[in-house]
Amino acid sequence: MKQITYPGIAPEDDADIEIIYPEAEEAAPTAGLWSEIKSITRDIIFAAVMAVLIVVFVVQPVKVEGTSMQPRLENDERIFVNKFKYNFEPIERGEIVVFWFPDDPTKSFIKRVIGLPGETIDMDPRGHITINGIPIDESYLAPERNQNAREKWNSVRSDWKYVKAHYYFVMGDNRDASNDSRSWGLVPEKYIYGKAMFRYWPLQRMGSLDSTSNYDE
């Protein structure tokens, strides 16, 4: 029987034939490097924009200046302030807040909220702060920094002891050395721009500032 021969050559029948398959064209090294640079630059710009937005609208790093909040906050410590919280939540007693000083709004102060709108604040004979006649828990105070509480309270103006609407009575934890509402009166709500949330420096004291149960040793 005669073998039928078909035209064409099959590659597996002839070792002398090399099949070259088309390959993807390699990108020029310069083009690849430029693309990488653009990608990194884009990511850096995005990160910078996000950082600016966070600082402007949400969280701001703040340096503590002074000793009025000892022992909870020491001079030169660094903290983060939440500037977003009070847009949606009420200011609560015991929170450490940052605000514009009413007598000079170019300066920022940091104190603890003691009296809320509508409350009457006073001090009992033992030197304990009372709200509407009831003593409040201030276990965050260090006794050695609260020796002259009664004496300093005697100088508080009577009209400051009733906290009117949209105002707050604030005090430093270092009661013997704090310039606060006892000396210059109430803080308008519109002047309070943030809550102290977290201490990030020094590292050995890093942590949340939310707790009011105990004073820091």
Annotate each PLM feature.
Residues K2-K38, F57-V58, V62-K63, P71-E217:
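Soluble "head" domains of membrane/secretory-pathway proteins
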Residues R42-V58:
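Hydrophobic membrane-insertion alpha-helices, especially the h-region
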